[in-house]
Amino acid sequence: MTSRDAARQAMQERILETTDRLFYGQGIRAVGVDTIAAEIGISKRTLYNYFPSKEALIVAYLSRRAVPRTVSDRPPLEQILGVFDWLDRWFASKAFRGCPFVNAVAEIGERSHPATKIAVNQKERRRVAFRDILTGFGVADPDGLATQLTILVEGAMAAALVRDDPAMARAAKSAARVLLTAAGVTADDDKSTVRKPNSLRRASKSPRQSEKPGPAPRRRRS
């Protein structure tokens, strides 16, 4: 990479960091390109050399927040419940302003907008992450349970914003435990296992399922 390329990359990252802070903290509609440029100390023309429009900035902002899931060696049940622990820490942050993806969809209001598609994909990514872990447990309906857990996450974010109460994450975690227990998922000696109801057990197989690795949440994005 040449020094020129490095300088351009650094400026692009600086623009994105500033855009992220302003869009998330003040709202996409409330913040114009001129505000972002002034905050950085560059002209609008210079900013447009990196991002040709505000729409491009919006897409880049959400794409940057839509961090792909990563594989973790933590026990699967910890990975699921750990999402709610992460929410608890996020909700307690002074910077918490709700889900950036929900906020963006509400502000933009266009189902066909690229930003809306990014938001939908991000939400589905979390649901699929839950489903993959639950499939490893061998629960009867991993897809349905993954959807229910996702709803708990989404509801916790909305409630925490409205009530200004981080405890919503802990309440959602308790509800998640109820759902998981009902599905036969338990924790035993720090190893996640599943105990199927009698009607679902097979005589030829043990009710205990082997632990399988799954995705872990990244802290900074939601």
Predicted regions and their residues:
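Short hydrophobic/aromatic patch on the recognition helix
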Residues: I40-F51
